[in-house]
């Protein structure tokens, strides 16, 4: 097992050519004294980014509910009895209107999500039109459409997509407790297709799903050992929804969430680390510590797919208090 000091020194090189991080390495980092860990992460953050700048993304569900997957955290699954109602796919005009509003609010990236295992060809053609129109507005484009088949990533790239999101969700050893309908390797296969097509990768996970600290270390290791590392790493704090299997999960202590952000920054120094789901349940002080620990991106807007998010006015107020500026 490497000492925490040795692990910290290794972090100076972003996007390693070979996988170097071990679960023991990352667990040692997560166990550092809290103030020391945040300080180290803040130092690394400043080597690669302006700490006063935050990237703003808006996420919209273009097709809600009716998903055949059984992800234990998700209210859109047909396997769970939740308040989320199925909705048809949005029209291109509806998506463009949402993108215009996001841009007017200050977002620089517009993300589109769809609840299905993966896009059928007919659905993909509709999403290609959405990507083209959103790109024409001058926004960065991102999509999270599930598992991709051969050639689909290339079509999205040709339409103007910048980022493709496909999260690993949790550590490999924990994965079977959360999802049964898709394998971990399925996720890695889609990430490989995305890279091969020349798209930037957005890939992160969820904490607060009854996992151990070592499980969180295992997730970070999987992300940090991707070659190259993801350009964007969303870190979600579980939003518990009535009717999902993870309703009633033990809530993650706020210090553990900040530790997770800090270690994501140390192990992936050149990636954007995004505060994603769960921010509405965090107080401003916790969010401020996350920014200090290296978070430099947020989802911006009052809704994330089907769960709540701080409204634009609240986020503008927080950023003003912290002297943060949008990228």
From Swiss-Prot:
Give residues annotated as binding [4Fe-4S] cluster: 67, 71, 74
Report the record's Gene Ontology biological process terms. biotin biosynthetic process
> Can you tell me which residues bind [2Fe-2S] cluster?
111, 142, 202, 274
Q: Which UniProt keywords apply?
A: 2Fe-2S, 4Fe-4S, Biotin biosynthesis, Iron, Iron-sulfur, Metal-binding, S-adenosyl-L-methionine, Transferase
**Entry GO MF terms:** 2 iron, 2 sulfur cluster binding; 4 iron, 4 sulfur cluster binding; biotin synthase activity; iron ion binding
Cross-referenced SMART domains: BATS, Elp3
The family database entries (CDD domains) matched by this protein are listed as: Radical_SAM (cd01335)
One matching Pfam family: BATS
Please write the reaction equations for the catalytic activity of this protein: (4R,5S)-dethiobiotin + (sulfur carrier)-SH + 2 reduced [2Fe-2S]-[ferredoxin] + 2 S-adenosyl-L-methionine = (sulfur carrier)-H + biotin + 2 5'-deoxyadenosine + 2 L-methionine + 2 oxidized [2Fe-2S]-[ferredoxin]
- InterPro entries referenced in this protein's UniProt entry, alphabetically: Aldolase_TIM, BATS_dom, Biotin_synth/BioAB, Biotin_synthase, Elp3/MiaA/NifB-like_rSAM, rSAM
Q: In which pathway does it act?
A: Cofactor biosynthesis; biotin biosynthesis; biotin from 7,8-diaminononanoate: step 2/2
Q: What class of enzyme is it?
A: transferase
Family recorded in the similarity comment: Belongs to the radical SAM superfamily. Biotin synthase family.
Q: What function is annotated for this protein?
A: Catalyzes the conversion of dethiobiotin (DTB) to biotin by the insertion of a sulfur atom into dethiobiotin via a radical-based mechanism.
List the HAMAP family hit by this protein, alphabetically: BioB
**PANTHER family xrefs:** BIOTIN SYNTHASE, BIOTIN SYNTHASE, MITOCHONDRIAL
Protein name as catalogued: Biotin synthase
Gene transcribed to yield this protein: bioB
């Amino acid at each position: 097992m490497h000492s925490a000091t040795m692990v910290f020194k290794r972090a100076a090189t972003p996007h390693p050519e070979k996988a170097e991080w071990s679960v023991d390495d990352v667990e040692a980092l997560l166990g550092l004294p809290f103030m020391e860990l945040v300080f180290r992460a803040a130092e690394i953050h400043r080597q690669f980014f302006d700490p006063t700048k935050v990237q703003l993304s808006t996420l919209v569900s273009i097709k809600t509910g009716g998903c055949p997957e059984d992800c234990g955290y998700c209210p859109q699954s047909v396997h769970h009895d939740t308040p989320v109602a199925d909705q048809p796919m949005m029209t291109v005009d509806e998506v463009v209107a949402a993108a215009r509003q996001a841009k007017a609010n200050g977002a620089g990236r517009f993300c589109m999500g769809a609840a299905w295992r993966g896009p059928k060809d007919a659905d993909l053609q509709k999403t290609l039109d959405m990507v083209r129109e959103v790109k024409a507005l001058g926004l960065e484009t991102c999509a999270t459409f599930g598992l991709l088949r051969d050639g689909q990533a290339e079509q999205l790239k040709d339409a103007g997509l910048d980022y493709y999101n496909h999260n690993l969700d949790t550590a490999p050893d924990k994965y079977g407790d959360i999802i049964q309908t898709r394998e971990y390797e399925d996720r890695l296969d889609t990430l490989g297709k995305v890279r091969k097509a020349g798209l930037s990768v957005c890939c992160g996970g969820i904490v607060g799903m009854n996992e151990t600290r070592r499980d969180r270390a295992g997730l970070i290791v999987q992300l940090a050992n991707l070659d190259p590392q993801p350009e964007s790493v969303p870190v979600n704090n579980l939003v518990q929804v009535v009717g999902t299997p993870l309703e009633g999960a033990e809530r993650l202590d706020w210090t553990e969430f900040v530790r997770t952000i800090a270690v994501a920054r140390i192990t992936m120094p050149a990636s954007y680390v995004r505060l994603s789901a769960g921010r509405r349940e965090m107080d401003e002080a916790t969010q401020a510590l996350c920014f200090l620990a290296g978070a430099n991106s947020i989802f911006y807007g009052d809704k994330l797919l089907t769960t709540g998010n701080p409204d634009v006015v609240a986020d503008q107020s927080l950023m003003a208090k912290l002297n943060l500026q949008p990228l």
